[in-house]
Amino acid sequence: MSWNNIGVVEMTPILFQFLLSSLCVFLLFVFIRFLNDIWWTPIRLQRVFRQQGIRGPSYGFLYGNTKEILNMRKESMSRPMDYLSHNIFPRLQPHLYSWLNIYGKNFLNWYGPRAQFVVTQVDFVKETMIKDQAYPKMDPEWFAKKLLGDGIVTSKGKKWAKHRRLANHAFHAESLKSMTPAMIASVEMMLKRWKQHEGREIDVFQEFKILTSEVISRTAFGSSYLDGKDIFDRLTQLGIIITRNSYKVKLPGISLFYKSNDEIEAEKLDQGLYDSILRIMEKREKESTMSGEVGSFGTDFLGLLMKAMNDADEKNRITAQDVVDECKTFYVAGQETTTTLLAWVIFLLGIHTDWQEKARQEVLNLFGQEIPNSDGLAKLKTVNMIINETLRLYPPVIFLTRKVKEETKFGKLTLPANVHIVVPTLALHHDEQIWGDDALLFKPERFSQGVAKATNNNAAAFFPFGLGPRSCVGLNFATNEAKIALAMILQCYSFALSPTYIHSPVQILTVRPQHGLQVMLQPL
């Protein structure tokens, strides 16, 4: 045996001991880090907040308060509501409703080991939403990332600013005006279908899903509902998966070793969305080439995105993945927001037929039986009041989240870095201290002198489309579409809730009627 071989034999146990020691040190480090994240840090944060007078339910090891939340939600959602009641806050967010009553306007609760500072004090809300640098958007959960990618809703910093400029250009006043004919044509198609249901029951929620899909497909992507149907179906399935996994705590890094059925399904849906949107992009590129105007992709939202993707200036250029992410975002937002808004307006007018008649008279006085026009839409005061009151009672998004970037003063409080802030829109919209004893009643007249007067100039009292620099860029698009649809429906039909309707609001991305919205149509 050579001396070299003897050296190898003698070194092997030493090397083994070294590797074993290194592994033990690494595992000890991982364990300490894990313990710090799931126990020491939460307990420290809980103590910091309690010393400042902020209370809340105690932290539970690893799961935080998620088990309590899931149990409360299961109980609150187990039965339908009285259809005359709009008190949906304790139904949709029973944990927040309960803890606000116990701990006051601002409190701390736990989403797994993550601290969530819930704020409903209006000055705190305003500061959180307006100071985007101090309180940026949170990184989306894994499932939400599959739904929206890194688009305008989830991106931050320079990327968000670049994408926001593009969206502002796509949805400015003149662009919206040019979209009106496509919106009208889509509503006409819907009303043509409704002729088969005259004097009978119809589920208008399903009808509005088709309508809004058609409108966003035509106006933003130059296609049709049928062209985008696969995309809408996949997005709907992703939305259901997201809702199913709300408040489920997952250990960090576990997905590297194990994927749940929902995660596998979400990845398949995400890939399918990417492929479908890529085909729409390729089709637009071919149309541009065939027209002989290479680089001219149209003036709609997709056209502006593709123009930016091919921009000669690298500072303005975006990637193909960026285009896909923005398309997903606008397919979701363009359908969800207006669908639920229209559904709840019809629901409320189906109950309050006096307001239905007031709205109809306003529409007929302005347009008669003529097609609505942009100038007339701006004069729909009663319809606008009804829309605002609907958005107050049934806001599409019932909470917003932000993150504390670094330790900061928040009024008299000191907030540690990385604490999550939750702003429950629904709680503020239903707050009797803001809106009075009739906060849970449908009273559009409260908006008769505008939003500012109704809220006593308090911007943080009513923000169905967000507040501050991150507010929804599609606000005017959604309300314009809703006004056109409502005006044309009121010209043709009166309606009342069907006896088969079950009042069971549920949150699946947005607040919607769980079992559809059945109404009885009567032609005028």
From Swiss-Prot:
Intracellular or extracellular location(s): Membrane
Chain segments annotated as coiled-coil in the UniProt record: none
InterPro entries recorded: Cyt_P450, Cyt_P450_CS, Cyt_P450_E_grp-I, Cyt_P450_sf, Cytochrome_P450_Monooxygen
Keyword annotations of the record: Heme, Iron, Membrane, Metal-binding, Monooxygenase, Oxidoreductase, Transmembrane, Transmembrane helix
Gene Ontology cellular component annotations, sorted alphabetically: membrane
Bilayer topology: Single-pass membrane protein
Role this protein plays: Probable heme-thiolate monooxygenase.
Protein name: Cytochrome P450 CYP749A22
Organism of this sequence: Panax ginseng (Korean ginseng)
Phylogenetic lineage: Eukaryota, Viridiplantae, Streptophyta, Embryophyta, Tracheophyta
